[in-house]
């Protein structure tokens, strides 16, 4: 939903041709094969923004980055809605919605309403 909202805004404010792509990562086994909803040819030599809801340990984002580095890209950026700064990996978000100082034991949950509004909860 987050990527769809960003794509809709980009369509509204620019003349960029935006192609949305879902990335499928097994969070319990991130070394397993990562797949996308579009072919590699569709994003080869194109600018790409990899978007995640919460950047916590960095595991999901870094394995996603690894997947897209297998093809040449024109430009590569990352974006997250919530940045928690508890990274296990040397990964950063180029674009952040909000940075939260939380303890490692706390949990951030992002939910999207039917009105396409995002709400983040600290649990």
Question: PLM features: what roles do these ranges have?
Answer:
Residues 1-123:
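PRPP-associated nucleotide enzymes
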């Amino acid at each position: 939903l987050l990527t769809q909202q960003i794509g809709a805004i980009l369509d509204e404010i620019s003349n960029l041709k935006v192609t949305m792509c879902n990335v499928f990562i097994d969070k319990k086994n991130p070394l397993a094969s990562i797949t996308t909803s579009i072919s590699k040819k569709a994003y080869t030599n194109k600018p790409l923004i990899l978007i995640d809801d919460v950047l916590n340990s960095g595991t999901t984002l870094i394995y996603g980055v690894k997947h897209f580095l297998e093809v040449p890209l024109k430009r590569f950026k990352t974006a997250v809605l919530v940045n928690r700064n508890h990274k296990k990996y040397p990964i950063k978000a180029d674009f952040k919605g909000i940075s939260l100082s939380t303890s490692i034991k706390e949990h951030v949950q992002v939910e999207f309403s039917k009105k396409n509004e995002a709400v983040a909860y600290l649990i």
